[in-house]
């Protein structure tokens, strides 16, 4: 019997200290991540907004927008995928539908946050959070909707930056009591904060190592020692690809050719390697042999 995606995520977590989860904004990035040795993948809501729609991460994308990108990734790889579902896209029935739709396409885990529906990036100022009671209701709706008990429902709290560390911890405890499996503690700034969080919250904890944000870029050993069970790198690959693409565009505009920026590009041979291109070619040769 095929293991569910949620079970594969839980097994990856059990086998890794900590589990490194890399952001993949498209299916090809997912293939590269798999062949590099990662055991879990991530689809960022900001990544969908920025890469697929050219929009800022301000709650402007819909469930279907994210579902499309997630489905492309789960179709390309068997690695378990964690997906950012923002605030769940509505009330209890909307959240229930969200869970069912993502479960249906083979997503392993989702994280849902306690920001207000007009959300902001977790590392930007002026965030606002809903009451603990409202977030508990969101979690209960999500837990009730899943059909696979191994499908992971992770609660993200943005409250530390708004209400302080202790308030964030108390919220996390309430979220676990409501049925959340794991906690995404957003925008912590010190290793001691992770230690304190882990000591108080009896559940797996995710640390978000996003670049150019509020959190120092600790290494995985430091985070593991501080109690983090998962380390997320949500948009590093996207940012790197953007910068490389910009250099190529500038070279084309300024120099009229790309010869001086070839070293920033992936070679055709490497592209074909990650795609498994030659296996597809061999299959074509078998199906449409010239010897027929």
UniProtKB/Swiss-Prot annotation:
Disulphide bridges: none
Binding-site list for Mg(2+): 84, 86
InterPro entries registered for this protein in UniProt: ICL/PEPM, Isocitrate_lyase_ph_CS, PrpB, Pyrv/PenolPyrv_kinase-like_dom, Pyrv_kinase-like_dom_sf
EC number(s) reported in the record: 4.1.3.30
Pfam families xrefs: PEP_mutase (PF13714)
Annotated metabolic or biological route of this protein: Organic acid metabolism; propanoate degradation
Keyword presence, Cell cycle: no
BP GO terms, sorted: propionate catabolic process, 2-methylcitrate cycle
Reactions this protein catalyses: (2S,3R)-3-hydroxybutane-1,2,3-tricarboxylate = pyruvate + succinate
KW Metal-binding (keyword) present: yes
Cofactor entry: Mg(2+)
Any one GO molecular-function label of the UniProt entry: magnesium ion binding
Enzyme class: lyase
Amino acids binding substrate: 44-46, 121-122, 156, 186, 208-210, 239, 268
Keywords: Lyase, Magnesium, Metal-binding
Gene3D superfamilies, per database record: Phosphoenolpyruvate-binding domains (3.20.20.60)
Subunit architecture: Homotetramer; dimer of dimers.
UniProt xrefs under HAMAP family: PrpB
Family statement drawn from the similarity comment of this UniProt entry: Belongs to the isocitrate lyase/PEP mutase superfamily. Methylisocitrate lyase family.
PANTHER family: CARBOXYVINYL-CARBOXYPHOSPHONATE PHOSPHORYLMUTASE, CHLOROPLASTIC, PHOSPHOENOLPYRUVATE CARBOXYLASE
Purpose: Involved in the catabolism of short chain fatty acids (SCFA) via the 2-methylcitrate cycle I (propionate degradation route). Catalyzes the thermodynamically favored C-C bond cleavage of (2R,3S)-2-methylisocitrate to yield pyruvate and succinate via an alpha-carboxy-carbanion intermediate.
Protein name: 2-methylisocitrate lyase
């Amino acid at each position: 019997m095929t293991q569910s995606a949620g079970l594969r995520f839980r097994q990856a977590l059990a086998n890794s200290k900590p589990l490194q989860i890399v952001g993949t904004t498209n299916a090809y990035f997912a293939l590269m991540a798999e062949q590099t040795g990662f055991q879990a993948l991530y689809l960022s809501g900001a990544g969908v907004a920025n890469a697929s729609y050219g929009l800022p991460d301000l709650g402007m994308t819909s469930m279907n927008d994210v579902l499309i990108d997630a489905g492309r990734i789960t179709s390309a790889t068997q690695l378990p995928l964690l997906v950012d579902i923002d605030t769940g896209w509505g009330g209890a029935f909307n959240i229930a539908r969200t869970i069912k739709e993502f479960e249906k396409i083979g997503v392993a885990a989702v994280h849902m946050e306690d920001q207000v529906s007009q959300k902001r990036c977790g590392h930007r100022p002026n965030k606002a959070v809903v009451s603990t009671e409202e977030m508990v209701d969101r979690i209960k709706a999500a837990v009730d909707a899943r059909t696979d008990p191994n499908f992971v429902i992770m609660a993200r709290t943005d409250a530390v930056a708004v209400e302080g560390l202790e308030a964030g911890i108390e919220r996390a405890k309430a979220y676990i009591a409501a049925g959340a499996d794991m906690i995404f503690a957003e925008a912590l700034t010190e290793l001691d904060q992770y230690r304190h969080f882990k000591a108080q919250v009896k559940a797996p904890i995710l640390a978000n190592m996003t670049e150019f944000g509020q959190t120092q870029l600790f290494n995985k050993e430091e985070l593991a020692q501080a109690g983090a069970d998962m380390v997320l790198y949500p948009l590093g690959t996207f940012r790197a690809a953007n910068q490389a693409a910009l250099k190529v565009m500038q070279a084309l505009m300024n120099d009229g050719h790309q010869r001086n920026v070839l070293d920033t590009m992936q070679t055709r041979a490497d592209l074909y390697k990650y795609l498994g291109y030659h296996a597809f070619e061999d299959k074509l040769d078998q199906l449409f042999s010239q010897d027929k």
